[in-house]
C-alpha cells in the first residue's frame, strides 16, 4: 500500500496525539512524546496543526513528525514500523525534497529515535551526526520523596505565576499568560500538570510542566526552569523531584527528560533528582541543499 504524507489539520491532531500516546513504552528509546506536541500547543491549535506531519499506510498512522523549528523535524514511528524499509525510505525522500513540505532547502536537522532504520538511511544519504543530547529517566515504581519545598499545582487563575517563572528562567518574553491558556486548552494538556516551587520567603523560584501519556506509560518533563535570581540553591532538583511525584500520581511508569550534552548543569540537576542517564542521542543534519 502507498504511504501517504499528510498535514492533519486541527481536526486531525487528536489522531496524531493518540498515536504518540500509544507508541510510548518503557522499552522504547526516548522519542517524540505527546507532551512535545502539548508544549508546542502554546502557539495555538492552528500553529500546532501546521507543524505536524503524519505518514500513513492503509489508513493507519505509521510516523509522526513535529516541525519544532522551521529547520528541525522531530520524528518517531510506530514501534512495529521502526525497521520498516519502505517507510524509512519514504521518510528520507520526503525530508530531502523541500517541495514535499517537511523541511526547507539548506541546513536542516532531524531528531529520530536511536535504532530507527530512518537514521541509517539518512547517514547513507550523506546526512551527518550533529548535536549530542542526554536523555535521562527516573523509574516511578518506588515512592518519590518529598521535594522539601512548597509546590503549587497551577490552574488557570494562576497562569501568570507559571508564565513569569518561565520567562525569568529562559530569558524569553514569549511565554505569556495567553500562551499558557492556549497550551492548557490543547488535547495533550488533559494529562498534564504545571508545578511551581516556592522558597521560604514565598518567592516563585522554579517551574515545570509534566505530561503523562497515560497509565503505565512514560511521562515527560517539558520544560523545567529555575528563576535566574534563585539559582544555586537546589530548586532545580526540588522541582524535578516534584515533577516525578506528579507523574507518579498520574500513573506514569517513569519520568523522562532530555537536554543537550553541553548543558552540564541541567544533567547534574536531573541526576541529583534521581534521574539516570541513558545512552546519548545524536541529532542528524544536512548541509547540502537536497
Residue map of PLM features:
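A short beta-loop-alpha structural element at the N-terminal edge
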Residues: 1-18, 150-163
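Conserved donor-binding loop and adjoining core beta-sheet/short helix segment
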Residues: 23-99, 208-219, 227
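Flexible, substrate/cofactor-facing loop regions flanked by secondary structure
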Residues: 34-37, 143-219
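A structural microfeature
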Residues: 63, 131-132, 205-206, 279
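Acyl-donor-binding surface of acyltransferase catalytic domains
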Residues: 69-148, 282-286
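Conserved acetyl-CoA-binding loop-helix of GNAT-fold acetyltransferases
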Residues: 83-97, 223-228, 232-249, 267-272
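Conserved hydrophobic beta-strand within the GNAT/NAT acetyltransferase core sheet
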Residues: 108-110, 221, 255-259
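Short glycine/proline-centered loop/turn elements that form peptide/ligand docking sites
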Residues: 180, 240, 263-266, 285-288
Amino acid at each position: 500500500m502507498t504511504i501517504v504524507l499528510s498535514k492533519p489539520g486541527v481536526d486531525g491532531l487528536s489522531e496524531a496525539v493518540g498515536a504518540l500516546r500509544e507508541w510510548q513504552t518503557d522499552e522504547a528509546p526516548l522519542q517524540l512524546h505527546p507532551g512535545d506536541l502539548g508544549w508546542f500547543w502554546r502557539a495555538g491549535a492552528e500553529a500546532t496543526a501546521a507543524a505536524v506531519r503524519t505518514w500513513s499506510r492503509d489508513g493507519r498512522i505509521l510516523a509522526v513528525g513535529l516541525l519544532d523549528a522551521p529547520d528541525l523535524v522531530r520524528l518517531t514511528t510506530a514501534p512495529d514500523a521502526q525497521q520498516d524499509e519502505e517507510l524509512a525510505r519514504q521518510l528520507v525522500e520526503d525530508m530531502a525534497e523541500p517541495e514535499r513540505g517537511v523541511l526547507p532547502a539548506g541546513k536542516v536537522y532531524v531528531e529520530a529515535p536511536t535504532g530507527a532504520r530512518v537514521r541509517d538511511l539518512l547517514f547513507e544519504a550523506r546526512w551527518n551526526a550533529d548535536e549530542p543530547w542526554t536523555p535521562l529517566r527516573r523509574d516511578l515504581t518506588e515512592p518519590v520523596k518529598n521535594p522539601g519545598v512548597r509546590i503549587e499545582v497551577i490552574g488557570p487563575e494562576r497562569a501568570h505565576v507559571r508564565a513569569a517563572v518561565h520567562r525569568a528562567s529562559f530569558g524569553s518574553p514569549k511565554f505569556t499568560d495567553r500562551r499558557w491558556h492556549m497550551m492548557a486548552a490543547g488535547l495533550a494538556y488533559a494529562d498534564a500538570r504545571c508545578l511551581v516551587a516556592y522558597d521560604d520567603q514565598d518567592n516563585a523560584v522554579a517551574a515545570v510542566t509534566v505530561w503523562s501519556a497515560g497509565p503505565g506509560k512514560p511521562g515527560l518533563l517539558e520544560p523545567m526552569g529555575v528563576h535566574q535570581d534563585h539559582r544555586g540553591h537546589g530548586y532545580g532538583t526540588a522541582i524535578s523531584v516534584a515533577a516525578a511525584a506528579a507523574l507518579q500520581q498520574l500513573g506514569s511508569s517513569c519520568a523522562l527528560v532530555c537536554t543537550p550534552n553541553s548543558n552540564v548543569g541541567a544533567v547534574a540537576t536531573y541526576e541529583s533528582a534521581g534521574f539516570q542517564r541513558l545512552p546519548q542521542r545524536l541529532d542528524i543534519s544536512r548541509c547540502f541543499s537536497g
